[in-house]
Amino acid sequence: MYFARELPRRHANAFHHISRSEFDQLVGKVDQLIQRSDSVDIPVQFLKITAAVGDAHTSVQLPLTKARFPVRLYWFGEELRVIRATTAAQSAIGLRLSAINQTPLSDIVARVREIISQDETPWYFEDRSPYLIIRPDVLHALGIIDDLKQAQFAFTTDDGAVVNLTLAPVADQIADWHDAYSSPPLYLQHNGDAFWFTALPDAKIIYVIFNHYDWLFFKARKLFSFLDNHADWKLVIDMRGNGGGDYHVGHWCLIKPILRRPALNRHDRLFVITGRATFSAAMSNAAQFRTETNATLLGEPPGEVPNSYQERKWFFLPYSHLQVNYSARHYKFLSTDVRTLMPDREIDPNWSDYRAGVDPVFKYLMSSATE
């Protein structure tokens, strides 16, 4: 199999999590599954191999899908709740997913774990699994649904009542979406912005949403120009929505300027927020904030292990033309081999705050500013 030959050859160390014999055995099992699978299932079957390799930069790129089931899910502790839905599924907002086509959530989770990188942090699974659970092709390949055009979803209310809905996939761009909150918290108001900041004069805080690295050099210059005129203000850099890019750019444009400003580089003046979706270069920069600055880290731990295989490269399979991603290099961002970049103060999302449009991290920052 071309895939089984090329992935170990190109990867920096394809056997850092599983042995060569385990890899070969899994390849044999997946090859048999592929022979019996519908074409729509094949990419997901390959994911079982890349997930076992362990690092999240190694994966098979699933085909772009125009339609997913019309709910958006989010883990709050052990509860997987509906945080967004179309009009057809609006009655499910706020409810807990309990089953799909009579397959209980616990079984769904077990099957989805097989296709998500198995050597990253638990927060990586929390970030990735809700996206996969609403994909018809994934559910079909995992034996949860037979019909790609509809499925029966079972939800549970807080009172324990079961709500059954038959849902059909829908394209994001044509759907009429409804959110669990009436007004989004600040950190969700600028998802489309790569880098955005605002002044909060009452708290003397400059709040930055850092989602991506595009044009960071120019945008960061504006940020520090403002900060230099507000020398006693705090700086909060929110990286919860940052899935990566070039960590060298983040280091050069943000960390180096902070190091040149000792009055800002203090644990009570500099704050960095991370979350389950903080990944790749963003995780790297968060680790550098920990090791090189005096920043206080808040929020959830990032989804990626700080010392791990990264730097994504890819090749294409000759017949299916599927894109196979792999890690080309091992990076070490912390001196000790800890599994998780733990925040100084861990603040987890909770359902009661989310539905009220309240950000618990922002709430903590504002309460600290008034103390």
Region locations from a protein language model:
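C-terminal "post-core" interaction segments
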Residues: 1-4, 157-160, 187, 192-371
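Flexible, low-complexity junctional segments that flank or bridge functional domains
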Residues: 1-234
